Amino acid sequence: MAAPRDNVTLLFKLYCLAVMTLMAAVYTIALRYTRTSDKELYFSTTAVCITEVIKLLLSVGILAKETGSLGRFKASLRENVLGSPKELLKLSVPSLVYAVQNNMAFLALSNLDAAVYQVTYQLKIPCTALCTVLMLNRTLSKLQWVSVFMLCAGVTLVQWKPAQATKVVVEQNPLLGFGAIAIAVLCSGFAGVYFEKVLKSSDTSLWVRNIQMYLSGIIVTLAGVYLSDGAEIKEKGFFYGYTYYVWFVIFLASVGGLYTSVVVKYTDNIMKGFSAAAAIVLSTIASVMLFGLQITLTFALGTLLVCVSIYLYGLPRQDTTSIQQGETASKERVIGV
């Protein structure tokens, strides 16, 4: 049977590419704006928690549509959620790691420009590659390893003399921001590969697994809210500092990942590479216009290296990842969750 991406038009693929690119770029810019605004600053831990709740509701809705009837939907929830405490415990691992990752993203964008963040965050590619080799016993081609080192060199150039934003009035700590990204990419690589391994361990639906993970995620993020900002939230309120822009960021975070996990089956690695590179370019342009970002030579060269390495990493390859045909669909399902 032909793969889904073989049956769609170029126009639809370009649509998928455009939406993925815009979501990645707009989310980063919008989040950066909400963290550097001169208005009352909201609690990022509450935003992460609400995002998990919305993802859970969306996944429940998609599962209901997938099962086709109320009876089968209830049976699926009863069997896979209420009757599977071990599976919930298993999915609590990526839930915890993703919660840390999402909170680190807020911390990073509070201290780094959106363009610098977008470029540096691409370190998730070598991190994921390393986790894939160690946890799933796959291999990478020589070209992929070259692209990994090229990407690391590009990020080093970007961080060597970071581009500065002249219109941002809040106090920033670039070193703290880079540390937050480092933690985020480690979390992204491990959690993504771990979740893929869980998906491949059974024939359980992706949306059931999402529900299991988001249920655990809500508990984990609520604990984070209490431990990190509990006293201030009790004084100021859970939704303190929320604006339309904050809700927009939450919407993008909730819908963006789920949308990407659905449309990625219609694209390929080259298109995803172009999408990531285009998102970097858009974020840079927006940062120059909105935040007064001053581009340095090292930033420009580093960004170019990162974009080229992303493209090279996604080039078609033969027998480089040791993934059988039956495993490919599972890999497609997990990207972007």
UniProtKB/Swiss-Prot annotation:
Protein's membrane topology: Multi-pass membrane protein
Entry GO MF terms: antiporter activity; CMP-N-acetylneuraminate transmembrane transporter activity
Lumenal side of membrane: 31-45, 109-114, 161-175, 229-243, 289-296
Q: Which reaction does it catalyse?
A: CMP-N-acetyl-beta-neuraminate(in) + CMP(out) = CMP-N-acetyl-beta-neuraminate(out) + CMP(in); CMP-N-acetyl-beta-neuraminate(in) + AMP(out) = CMP-N-acetyl-beta-neuraminate(out) + AMP(in); CDP-L-ribitol(in) + CDP(out) = CDP-L-ribitol(out) + CDP(in); UMP(out) + CMP-N-acetyl-beta-neuraminate(in) = UMP(in) + CMP-N-acetyl-beta-neuraminate(out)
Instruction: Quote the InterPro entries the UniProt record gives.
Output: Nuc_sug_transpt
- Give the span(s) annotated as Disordered: 316-337
> What are the GO BP annotations of this UniProt entry?
carbohydrate metabolic process; CMP-N-acetylneuraminate biosynthetic process; CMP-N-acetylneuraminate transmembrane transport; N-acetylneuraminate metabolic process; protein modification process
Q: Which residues lie on this side of the membrane: Cytoplasmic?
A: 1-9, 65-87, 136-141, 197-209, 263-269, 316-337
Coiled-coil region(s): none
**Transmembrane segments annotated in the record for this chain:** 10-30, 46-64, 88-108, 115-135, 142-160, 176-196, 210-228, 244-262, 270-288, 297-315
Query: Which keywords describe this protein according to UniProt?
Result: Antiport, Congenital disorder of glycosylation, Disease variant, Golgi apparatus, Membrane, Sugar transport, Transmembrane, Transmembrane helix, Transport
Instruction: Tell me any Pfam family this protein matches.
Output: Nuc_sug_transp
Q: Which GO terms describe its cellular component?
A: Golgi apparatus; Golgi membrane; membrane; plasma membrane
Quick one: where is this thing mainly located? Golgi
Question: Where does it live in the cell?
Answer: Golgi apparatus membrane; Golgi apparatus
Q: What is the effect of changing residue 101 to H?
A: In CDG2F; results in decreased CMP-sialic acid transmembrane transporter activity when expressed in a heterologous system; does not affect localization to Golgi apparatus
Residue positions binding CMP-N-acetyl-beta-neuraminate: 55, 101-102, 117-124, 188, 210-214, 272
Disease entry from the Swiss-Prot or TrEMBL record: Congenital disorder of glycosylation 2F: CDGs are a family of severe inherited diseases caused by a defect in protein N-glycosylation. They are characterized by under-glycosylated serum proteins. These multisystem disorders present with a wide variety of clinical features, such as disorders of the nervous system development, psychomotor retardation, dysmorphic features, hypotonia, coagulation disorders, and immunodeficiency. The broad spectrum of features reflects the critical role of N-glycoproteins during embryonic development, differentiation, and maintenance of cell functions.
Function in brief: Transports CMP-sialic acid from the cytosol into the Golgi apparatus, functioning as an antiporter that exchanges CMP-sialic acid for CMP. Binds both CMP-sialic acid and free CMP, but has higher affinity for free CMP. Also able to exchange CMP-sialic acid for AMP and UMP. Also mediates the transport of CDP-ribitol.
Family statement drawn from the similarity comment of this UniProt entry: Belongs to the nucleotide-sugar transporter family. SLC35A subfamily.
* Quaternary structure and interacting proteins, as annotated: Monomer.
Q: Which NCBIfam families match?
A: nst
Official protein name in the record: CMP-sialic acid transporter
Q: Which organism is it from?
A: Homo sapiens
Gene encoding it? SLC35A1
